[in-house]
């Protein structure tokens, strides 16, 4: 039985749906003038992405460009501010998604390189003159895929107890947004997708007031790759781009130290880049100018095809291509070092993890201690023999020790063990590191362990993405009350700066996290028993993964 869930499966978890927008005839509905840019008219939305009725109708403006589109000679260039336009543009339907794997949420006809657009959802009936708190959500998808359909902004806004503005948007993904290479390093073209995100933040600061949003009350949030993105921005309070563009942050299954983010010259990235350029017929031994010209003129279907092929060639061993790189723009310093130096934005934050993150990804065919260690060593080649020996002890081998907490796997001997170790490496301990650094610097911080299934098979536990639909109070989740509770905490954080102020009735008070306590408190969200608990999951292992001496070997 193959237990690895690929990104295509993730994208297919719910079918793509067009927004149910109410047509407005006659005068333009909710006409908004964006100073120095142009005017757009809005619409209303009354249903979720899965065609269920929203609790209340929301105002919406959709498919608005926030940049000059990266097409033609602008492919593989940093995004630029859009040019002004005359007249009124109708903003009543979603814009194109960025080029990526063809899947149910991102069919071919929905895709375009001209994809840098955003959507705004706002509580209906509140005058635009009243400036409301704003949530800007960054979609996930391993930096390989994702779109507006990854986060139901209308549902999040409609379910908020207090008036709110929600923004979601597209940024370039896979090779068009992230192509680690010496060429891109030399030409200053690394981390284009992260730079797209920052341009959107700047656009929000300039124009969100026209949509009735408060630019001084912006929360950025994201899950998975979106959460890693939040971490990259949160831990970048240094250099020339250190102006605060947000007031709060939600790191959902993500962190600046999640997984690993090597630099442009990482040997595996060179191998992947060589495969990429060879497929496209671009000789990377020519001058930078010649190679870039070839890449910019390459057929877009060929770019989609080779990006998808290379991603899945490395998916089983979790050494993904097309990632943000340390040393590149907005990520000049390793995330761990920025934490040690305190060069992050000291603004309130939430960090979250689901209980069994790694079971969404890890393989079900490892049987021996050697295979367990080889798998981790392949992901982090700089680990020493001593490191590997310590890992073997930290995660007792169920084939050797009957009392190992990782015994009784549902399939291969090592499945529970490798899932726990990779969860700690990629998500759980990095989330703890973020909470520790923020809270010990005096920043209001809250941490959550999400322990609620959403129809995954029992052998997968509570895997990565289990919390997705609960975030926006999804109407068809396995445990609807958890949707109310979880969304209540998050929307309260956005609107009041504290997850408790407008939490769902009957849900417990969520205490702030204090990383310098021996056992800091967090909340566990689970059916029938959401409660406060101590943050003690695999405590010794997390200290190992978070060790500053080891961080460079882990590319954290």
Curated annotation (Swiss-Prot):
Induction profile: Transcript accumulation reached its highest level in 4 hour old cultures.
Example of a GO MF term: hydrolase activity
Enzyme Commission designation: 3.1.1.1
UniProt keyword terms in alphabetical order: Glycoprotein, Hydrolase, Lipid degradation, Lipid metabolism, Secreted, Signal
Residues carrying covalently attached carbohydrate according to the record: 46, 263, 305, 411, 453
Signal peptide: 1-21
Subcellular location: Secreted
Domain of life, source organism: Eukaryota
Reactions the enzyme catalyzes: a carboxylic ester + H2O = an alcohol + a carboxylate + H(+)
Activity's dependence on pH: Optimum pH is 7.0.
Family that this chain belongs to: Belongs to the type-B carboxylesterase/lipase family.
Record protein name field: Secreted lipase 4
Organism of provenance: Gibberella zeae (strain ATCC MYA-4620 / CBS 123657 / FGSC 9075 / NRRL 31084 / PH-1)
Taxon lineage: Eukaryota, Fungi, Dikarya, Ascomycota, Pezizomycotina
Gene: FGL4
């Amino acid at each position: 039985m193959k237990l690895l869930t690929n990104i295509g499966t993730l994208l297919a978890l719910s079918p793509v749906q067009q927004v149910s927008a109410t047509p407005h005839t006659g005068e333009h509905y909710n006409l908004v003038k964006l100073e120095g840019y142009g005017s757009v008219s809005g619409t209303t939305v009354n249903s979720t992405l899965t065609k269920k009725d929203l609790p209340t109708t929301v105002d919406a403006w959709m498919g608005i460009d926030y940049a000059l589109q990266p097409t033609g000679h602008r492919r593989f260039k940093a995004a630029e501010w859009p040019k002004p336009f005359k007249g009124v543009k109708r903003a009543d339907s979603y814009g194109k998604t960025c080029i990526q794997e063809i899947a149910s949420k991102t069919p071919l006809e929905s895709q375009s390189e001209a994809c840098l657009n955003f959507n705004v959802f706002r509580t209906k009936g509140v005058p635009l003159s009243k400036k409301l708190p704003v949530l800007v959500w960054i979609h996930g998808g391993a930096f390989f895929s994702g779109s507006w359909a990854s986060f139901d902004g209308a549902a999040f806004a409609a379910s908020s107890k207090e008036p709110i503005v929600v923004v979601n948007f597209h940024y370039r993904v896979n090779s068009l947004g992230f192509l680690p290479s010496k060429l891109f390093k030399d030409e200053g073209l690394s981390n284009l997708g992260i730079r797209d995100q920052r341009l959107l933040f700047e656009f929000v600061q300039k124009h969100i007031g026209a949509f009735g949003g408060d630019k001084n009350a912006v929360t950025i949030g994201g899950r998975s790759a979106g959460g890693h993105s939040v971490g990259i921005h949160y831990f970048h309070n240094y250099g020339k781009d250190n102006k605060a563009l947000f007031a709060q942050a939600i790191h959902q299954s993500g962190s600046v130290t999640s997984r690993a983010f090597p630099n442009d010259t990482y040997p595996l990235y060179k191998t992947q880049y060589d495969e990429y350029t060879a497929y496209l017929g671009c000789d990377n031994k020519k001058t930078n100018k010649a190679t870039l010209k070839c890449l910019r003129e390459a057929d877009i279907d060929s770019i989609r095809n080779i990006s998808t092929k290379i991603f899945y060639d490395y998916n089983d061993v979790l050494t993904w291509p097309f990632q943000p790189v340390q040393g590149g723009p907005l990520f000049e310093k390793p995330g761990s070092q920025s934490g040690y130096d305190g060069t992050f934005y000291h603004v309130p934050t939430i960090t979250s993890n689901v209980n069994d993150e790694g079971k969404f990804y890890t393989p079900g065919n490892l049987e021996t201690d050697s295979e367990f260690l080889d798998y981790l060593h392949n992901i982090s080649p700089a680990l020493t023999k001593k490191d590997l020996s310590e890992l073997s002890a930290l995660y007792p081998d169920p084939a050797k020790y009957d009392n190992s907490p990782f015994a009784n796997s549902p399939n291969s001997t090592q499945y529970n063990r490798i899932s726990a170790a990779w969860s700690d490496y990629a998500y759980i301990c990095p989330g703890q590191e973020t909470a520790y650094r923020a809270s010990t610097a005096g920043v209001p911080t809250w941490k959550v362990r999400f322990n609620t299934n959403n129809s995954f098979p029992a052998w997968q536990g509570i895997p990565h993405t289990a919390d997705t639909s609960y975030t926006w109070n999804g109407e068809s989740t396995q445990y609807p009350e958890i949707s109310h509770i979880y969304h209540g905490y998050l929307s309260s954080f956005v609107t009041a700066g504290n997850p408790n102020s407008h939490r769902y009735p009957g849900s417990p008070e969520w205490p702030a996290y204090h990383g310098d306590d021996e056992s800091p408190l967090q909340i566990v969200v689970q059916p029938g028993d959401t409660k406060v608990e101590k943050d003690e999951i695999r405590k010794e292992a997390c200290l190992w993964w978070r060790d500053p001496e080891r961080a460079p070997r882990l590319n954290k």
